[in-house]
Amino acid sequence: RSSINNFDLKYASDAIFGEYLLEEMPDYDGRLLPSREVFILFSTRLFTLLGCLPVNGFDRQLTTHELRYFQYQMAKSVLAGVDAWLIRRGLYVSSYKRRVDLFLRKNEVKPNIKSLVLWSLSMKLNPEPDLLTPIQVSIIYDEVNNFFIREMESGLSWHFKKPISEYSSLRYAILKNPYEVSKICYSSIFRSSSVYLNRYRLIMAQFLLASAWSIKGIDLDLVQK
Protein backbone atom coordinates (compact mmCIF):
# COMPACT_ATOMS: atom_id res chain seq x y z
CA ARG A 1 0.00 0.00 0.00
CA SER A 2 1.01 3.62 -0.36
CA SER A 3 2.62 4.69 2.93
CA ILE A 4 5.62 6.57 4.26
CA ASN A 5 7.31 3.32 5.30
CA ASN A 6 6.96 1.74 1.87
CA PHE A 7 7.87 4.97 0.09
CA ASP A 8 11.08 5.33 2.10
CA LEU A 9 11.88 1.64 1.74
CA LYS A 10 11.57 1.92 -2.03
CA TYR A 11 13.45 5.17 -2.57
CA ALA A 12 15.74 5.62 0.44
CA SER A 13 17.00 2.09 1.10
CA ASP A 14 19.61 -0.27 -0.17
CA ALA A 15 18.64 -3.64 -1.60
CA ILE A 16 17.66 -6.13 1.07
CA PHE A 17 18.14 -9.88 0.64
CA GLY A 18 19.18 -9.58 -2.96
CA GLU A 19 20.12 -7.09 -5.61
CA TYR A 20 16.72 -6.85 -7.29
CA LEU A 21 14.30 -6.94 -4.36
CA LEU A 22 13.53 -3.21 -4.36
CA GLU A 23 12.87 -3.35 -8.09
CA GLU A 24 10.04 -5.78 -7.37
CA MET A 25 8.25 -3.23 -5.22
CA PRO A 26 5.66 -1.06 -6.98
CA ASP A 27 6.38 2.61 -7.62
CA TYR A 28 4.98 5.10 -5.14
CA ASP A 29 4.12 8.74 -5.70
CA GLY A 30 4.86 11.12 -2.83
CA ARG A 31 2.08 13.36 -4.10
CA LEU A 32 -0.49 10.65 -3.42
CA LEU A 33 0.30 9.51 0.10
CA PRO A 34 -3.01 9.03 1.96
CA SER A 35 -3.98 11.59 4.56
CA ARG A 36 -4.06 8.88 7.24
CA GLU A 37 -0.25 8.90 7.14
CA VAL A 38 -0.47 12.13 9.12
CA PHE A 39 -2.55 10.39 11.79
CA ILE A 40 0.00 7.56 11.90
CA LEU A 41 2.85 10.07 12.24
CA PHE A 42 0.97 11.83 15.01
CA SER A 43 0.26 8.67 16.97
CA THR A 44 3.77 7.23 16.66
CA ARG A 45 5.68 10.46 17.32
CA LEU A 46 3.76 11.57 20.41
CA PHE A 47 6.16 9.40 22.37
CA THR A 48 9.05 11.67 21.36
CA LEU A 49 7.45 14.36 23.52
CA LEU A 50 6.51 12.14 26.46
CA GLY A 51 9.44 9.74 26.60
CA CYS A 52 12.32 12.08 25.91
CA LEU A 53 13.36 12.81 29.50
CA PRO A 54 13.67 11.07 32.86
CA VAL A 55 11.05 11.95 35.46
CA ASN A 56 13.02 14.89 36.87
CA GLY A 57 14.60 15.84 33.56
CA PHE A 58 13.52 19.48 33.65
CA ASP A 59 14.96 20.05 37.11
CA ARG A 60 18.55 18.82 36.96
CA GLN A 61 21.57 18.80 34.69
CA LEU A 62 21.24 15.92 32.23
CA THR A 63 24.08 13.53 31.51
CA THR A 64 25.66 13.41 28.06
CA HIS A 65 23.70 10.25 27.25
CA GLU A 66 20.43 11.82 28.42
CA LEU A 67 21.12 14.98 26.42
CA ARG A 68 21.82 12.96 23.28
CA TYR A 69 18.59 11.00 23.67
CA PHE A 70 16.54 14.11 24.46
CA GLN A 71 17.84 16.10 21.50
CA TYR A 72 17.45 13.18 19.11
CA GLN A 73 13.83 12.74 20.17
CA MET A 74 13.21 16.46 19.74
CA ALA A 75 14.65 16.26 16.23
CA LYS A 76 12.35 13.35 15.37
CA SER A 77 9.36 15.31 16.65
CA VAL A 78 10.18 18.41 14.59
CA LEU A 79 10.87 16.41 11.43
CA ALA A 80 7.54 14.60 11.89
CA GLY A 81 5.86 18.01 11.87
CA VAL A 82 7.75 18.85 8.68
CA ASP A 83 6.62 15.56 7.12
CA ALA A 84 3.00 16.24 8.04
CA TRP A 85 3.20 19.65 6.35
CA LEU A 86 4.71 18.11 3.20
CA ILE A 87 2.19 15.26 2.99
CA ARG A 88 -0.69 17.72 3.09
CA ARG A 89 0.74 19.42 0.01
CA GLY A 90 1.84 16.35 -1.92
CA LEU A 91 5.52 17.28 -1.54
CA TYR A 92 6.86 14.32 0.44
CA VAL A 93 10.22 12.94 -0.71
CA SER A 94 12.55 10.32 0.77
CA SER A 95 15.56 12.55 1.56
CA TYR A 96 15.64 14.33 4.93
CA LYS A 97 17.64 17.18 3.43
CA ARG A 98 15.25 17.63 0.53
CA ARG A 99 12.23 17.51 2.83
CA VAL A 100 13.66 20.26 5.01
CA ASP A 101 14.65 22.29 1.96
CA LEU A 102 11.13 22.00 0.52
CA PHE A 103 9.54 22.93 3.84
CA LEU A 104 11.68 26.06 4.17
CA ARG A 105 11.35 27.11 0.52
CA LYS A 106 7.62 26.54 0.17
CA ASN A 107 6.63 27.75 3.60
CA GLU A 108 6.86 31.18 5.18
CA VAL A 109 8.36 30.42 8.58
CA LYS A 110 9.65 32.64 11.33
CA PRO A 111 13.42 32.72 11.94
CA ASN A 112 13.09 30.70 15.16
CA ILE A 113 11.19 27.92 13.33
CA LYS A 114 13.78 27.87 10.56
CA SER A 115 16.55 27.53 13.13
CA LEU A 116 14.63 24.78 14.92
CA VAL A 117 14.10 22.79 11.72
CA LEU A 118 17.72 23.14 10.60
CA TRP A 119 18.94 22.14 14.06
CA SER A 120 16.67 19.08 13.94
CA LEU A 121 18.07 18.03 10.57
CA SER A 122 21.63 18.37 11.87
CA MET A 123 20.79 16.39 14.99
CA LYS A 124 19.06 13.65 12.99
CA LEU A 125 22.01 13.21 10.63
CA ASN A 126 24.77 13.75 13.19
CA PRO A 127 23.43 13.15 16.70
CA GLU A 128 26.09 14.92 18.75
CA PRO A 129 24.41 16.62 21.72
CA ASP A 130 24.82 20.24 22.74
CA LEU A 131 25.49 20.92 26.40
CA LEU A 132 22.22 22.33 27.75
CA THR A 133 21.20 23.73 31.10
CA PRO A 134 17.81 22.73 32.58
CA ILE A 135 16.38 26.09 31.47
CA GLN A 136 17.60 25.50 27.90
CA VAL A 137 16.08 22.02 27.93
CA SER A 138 12.72 23.51 28.94
CA ILE A 139 12.91 26.18 26.23
CA ILE A 140 13.74 23.68 23.47
CA TYR A 141 11.03 21.31 24.64
CA ASP A 142 8.48 24.13 24.65
CA GLU A 143 9.39 25.20 21.09
CA VAL A 144 9.30 21.63 19.79
CA ASN A 145 6.06 20.77 21.59
CA ASN A 146 4.31 23.85 20.19
CA PHE A 147 5.58 23.20 16.66
CA PHE A 148 4.62 19.52 16.70
CA ILE A 149 1.11 20.09 18.04
CA ARG A 150 0.44 23.00 15.67
CA GLU A 151 1.50 21.07 12.56
CA MET A 152 -0.23 17.89 13.64
CA GLU A 153 -3.49 19.63 14.45
CA SER A 154 -3.44 21.17 10.97
CA GLY A 155 -2.68 17.77 9.44
CA LEU A 156 -5.35 15.99 11.48
CA SER A 157 -7.90 18.64 10.51
CA TRP A 158 -7.03 17.92 6.87
CA HIS A 159 -7.29 14.15 7.38
CA PHE A 160 -10.55 14.09 9.34
CA LYS A 161 -12.02 17.07 7.45
CA LYS A 162 -12.93 18.63 10.79
CA PRO A 163 -11.21 21.34 12.83
CA ILE A 164 -8.89 19.65 15.34
CA SER A 165 -7.58 21.90 18.07
CA GLU A 166 -7.97 19.99 21.32
CA TYR A 167 -8.66 16.63 22.92
CA SER A 168 -12.45 16.68 22.55
CA SER A 169 -12.38 17.54 18.84
CA LEU A 170 -9.90 14.74 18.07
CA ARG A 171 -11.88 12.22 20.11
CA TYR A 172 -15.08 13.20 18.30
CA ALA A 173 -13.36 12.99 14.89
CA ILE A 174 -12.03 9.49 15.58
CA LEU A 175 -15.40 8.22 16.82
CA LYS A 176 -17.12 9.62 13.72
CA ASN A 177 -14.55 8.27 11.26
CA PRO A 178 -15.84 5.08 9.56
CA TYR A 179 -12.37 3.59 9.05
CA GLU A 180 -11.20 4.07 12.64
CA VAL A 181 -14.51 2.85 14.08
CA SER A 182 -14.49 -0.22 11.82
CA LYS A 183 -11.01 -1.17 13.07
CA ILE A 184 -12.13 -0.91 16.67
CA CYS A 185 -15.34 -2.88 16.06
CA TYR A 186 -13.69 -5.58 13.95
CA SER A 187 -11.00 -6.16 16.54
CA SER A 188 -13.48 -6.19 19.42
CA ILE A 189 -16.16 -8.37 17.80
CA PHE A 190 -14.33 -10.79 15.53
CA ARG A 191 -11.04 -11.09 17.36
CA SER A 192 -12.29 -10.53 20.91
CA SER A 193 -9.44 -8.10 21.32
CA SER A 194 -9.38 -4.59 22.70
CA VAL A 195 -5.97 -3.80 21.20
CA TYR A 196 -7.23 -1.08 18.85
CA LEU A 197 -9.51 0.47 21.44
CA ASN A 198 -6.64 0.57 23.93
CA ARG A 199 -4.37 2.04 21.26
CA TYR A 200 -6.78 4.91 20.65
CA ARG A 201 -7.12 5.47 24.38
CA LEU A 202 -3.34 5.65 24.64
CA ILE A 203 -3.15 8.15 21.78
CA MET A 204 -5.74 10.36 23.45
CA ALA A 205 -4.00 10.16 26.82
CA GLN A 206 -0.66 11.08 25.24
CA PHE A 207 -2.26 13.96 23.34
CA LEU A 208 -3.76 15.29 26.57
CA LEU A 209 -0.42 15.15 28.37
CA ALA A 210 1.45 16.81 25.50
CA SER A 211 -1.19 19.53 25.23
CA ALA A 212 -1.06 20.17 28.97
CA TRP A 213 2.58 21.25 28.84
CA SER A 214 3.57 24.88 28.92
CA ILE A 215 6.86 26.44 29.94
CA LYS A 216 4.75 28.58 32.29
CA GLY A 217 3.28 25.52 34.00
CA ILE A 218 1.25 22.35 33.53
CA ASP A 219 -2.48 22.60 32.79
CA LEU A 220 -3.75 20.41 35.63
CA ASP A 221 -7.31 20.37 34.28
CA LEU A 222 -6.10 18.60 31.13
CA VAL A 223 -3.93 16.19 33.11
CA GLN A 224 -6.88 15.18 35.30
CA LYS A 225 -8.93 14.20 32.24
Where in this protein do the model-derived segments appear?
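Extended ligand-binding clefts on enzyme/binding-domain cores
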Residues: 116
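Short, hydrophobic/amphipathic alpha-helical patches that form generic packing surfaces
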Residues: 76-87, 119-122, 199-217
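Solvent-exposed interaction patches of small proteins and small membrane subunits
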Residues: 121-124, 225
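C-terminal amphipathic alpha-helical interaction region
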Residues: 168-205, 210-225
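Conserved NTP/Mg2+-binding pocket subregion across the NTase superfamily
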Residues: 1-112, 125-192
